[in-house]
Design a protein with these regions (language model features):
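Post-transcriptional modification and biogenesis factors for structured RNAs
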Residues: 1-178
Length: 178
C-alpha cells in the first residue's frame, strides 16, 4: 500500500467547486467563539460540497488569519453569509422549506443513527456556542433535533467534531443507498 501524493487526489479547482452540485445541507453556526472551530467547519463543508454556511451572532467571519489557518482556503470555496440573529435565520430557512435541525441534547431528540433523510429535502443544521450549545429559543423553533449518542462521562463534543460527524452521516445518507 502506498500513500497518495497531493497531485493524485483529483482536487477540484475553485471554479469547478463553485459549479458543482452541492449537498443540500446548510450549516448554521451561532455564537461560535473559537476561530479554529469556524475554520475547521469551513474545511468540512468544502470536503462534502455543502451548500453554504451561515455565521450568526458573535461568530467571526472571513477574511480572518486565524480562521484561514484551519480552513486552508475553504473560505474561498464554500459560500457563506453573516446574520446577527439566529432566530430570524431559522424562520427564514423554514419559509424557504428548509428543514431546520438543532444539533443538541434535548428531550425527544432523534439519535443521529436513527435519523432518516428525504433525498429531495434541504436541511439546515444548527450548531451552538461551545459552552452553552444551541440557545433554547432556537431549539424551540427548529423543526427537530438530532443528538449524537455519547457513551462517556463528558457528553460534550467540540463543535467542529460534531459538525464533522453529522455532516458525514447526512452526506452518506443523502448520497448512497442503505
Amino acid at each position: 500500500m502506498r500513500k497518495l501524493e497531493n497531485s493524485e487526489l483529483d482536487r477540484k479547482s475553485i471554479e469547478d467547486f463553485k459549479e458543482s452540485t452541492k449537498t443540500p445541507l446548510i450549516l448554521v453556526l451561532d455564537d461560535i467563539r473559537s476561530l479554529h472551530n469556524i475554520g475547521s467547519v469551513f474545511r468540512t463543508a468544502d470536503a462534502f460540497l455543502i451548500e453554504k454556511i451561515i455565521l450568526c451572532g458573535i461568530t467571526a467571519t472571513p477574511p480572518n488569519k486565524e480562521i484561514h489557518k484551519t480552513a486552508l482556503g475553504a473560505t474561498e470555496t464554500v459560500a457563506w453569509e453573516h446574520h446577527e440573529n439566529v432566530l430570524e435565520v431559522i424562520e427564514n430557512l423554514k419559509k424557504d422549506n428548509v428543514l431546520t435541525l438543532a444539533i443538541e441534547q434535548v428531550e425527544s431528540a432523534v439519535f443521529l443513527q436513527d435519523f432518516k433523510v428525504e433525498k429531495n429535502q434541504k436541511y439546515a443544521l444548527i450548531f451552538g456556542n461551545e459552552v452553552y450549545g444551541v440557545a433554547q429559543e432556537a431549539v424551540a423553533i427548529c423543526d427537530g433535533c438530532i443528538e449524537i449518542p455519547q457513551l462517556g462521562t463528558k457528553h460534550s463534543l467540540n463543535i467542529s467534531v460534531s459538525a464533522g460527524i453529522v455532516v458525514w452521516d447526512l452526506f452518506k445518507k443523502l448520497n448512497w443507498p442503505n
